[in-house]
Amino acid sequence: MRFFLLAFIPLTTLTVMAQQSQSTDVPSIRSHLCIDVKATLGEGALYCMHDSCLYWVDIEEGILYQCRLPVQHCRRFKLPGRIGTVVRDKNHHAILAMETGIYSLDLHTEELCLICSPAENQTGIRFNDGKCSPAGSLWAGTMSTTGKRKSGALIRISPDGKFTKMIDSVSISNGIIWSPDGTKMYYVDTPTSTVVEYDYNTKADTITNPRIVIRIPHEMGYPDGMTIDRDGNLWIAHWGGSGVYCWNPETGKLLARVEIPAKNVTSCAFGGTDLDTLYITTARTGNSEETLKNYPHSGSLFIAFPDNRGIPSYSFSKPEQ
């Protein structure tokens, strides 16, 4: 089935500065407006080393963006329904967590195919953020579409289509990432304002021994999507916090803040040839008209250049691959 509208969006080179950080005791990093798309709910930033492309989604509008930098345009795919997150396989497919299941989008032919769908009734539930694990499965969270708390979960979806519930009673499943050595997994359930660390077993693709390693003050907003650098520091997008905050999970200390001229910052990913550029998504939803006047580029894609490098993202990989 083909459902897509293909468009090209110009790259913006405008440099912008956010308001002065309230976290005056940590370094402040400047951000730049990269692509002015004004997404309703930008999310799911992912950089793929296989094709040197950045991917992200507008959840509410059902749009997938694919941008090959530094070429100054990106492709826009309009799909039939909300998209919670995007990952890549090792071929030419984007793997999408949509409302009715997990889909594969052929980036060459634009054909959308269902891989698998949940066995249980998903009424009032949608997928949200997610990433591929070192073992090659997709770990994607769910959340209520009506605001009901503890009705979501973190689901592991294997390439053969098997769904396994890994964490239950989640309110807003959000950021998830693995440590550079693959022995830890970090996870965010947004309303808890915490980051939980788990021991991760790559061979079994399982987690054990949860413990809170970061507690985020409410005045800094709420934790949303996140990524990790080669030193093991977490870069967390703060919804309502106008920034991406760098936290040390070993100490729980805040190390730096990337200032973003948007109130609701949603996800981030290291990208570029050397994985030294931080790409940041934002949202227009959840803002008053006055806030949108103060932050007119809300919903756009931003970039920053911290003195840190990320690690490559994992692929949705079938056993034979």
Map each language-model feature to its residues.
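A short helix->beta-strand "capping" segment at the edge of beta-propeller domains
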Residues: 21-39, 67-72, 76-78, 116-117, ...
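Beta-rich, blade/repeat-based domains predominating
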Residues: 37-51, 80-95, 121-137, 166-184, ...
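Conserved beta-strand positions in repeat-built beta-propeller and related beta-rich domains
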Residues: 48-49, 54-59, 95-100, 138-148, ...
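A short loop-to-beta-strand structural motif that recurs across blades of beta-propeller domains
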Residues: 63-65, 101-103, 152-155, 194-196, ...
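Hydrophobic alpha-helical segments and helix pairs
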Residues: 112-168
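Loop/turn-rich, solvent-exposed surfaces of beta-rich toroidal or solenoidal domains
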Residues: 194, 215-253
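Short loop/turn segments immediately following beta-strands, especially the blade-tip
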Residues: 198-205, 306-311
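Blade-level signature of beta-propeller repeat domains, shared across WD40, Kelch, NHL, RCC1
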Residues: 269-321
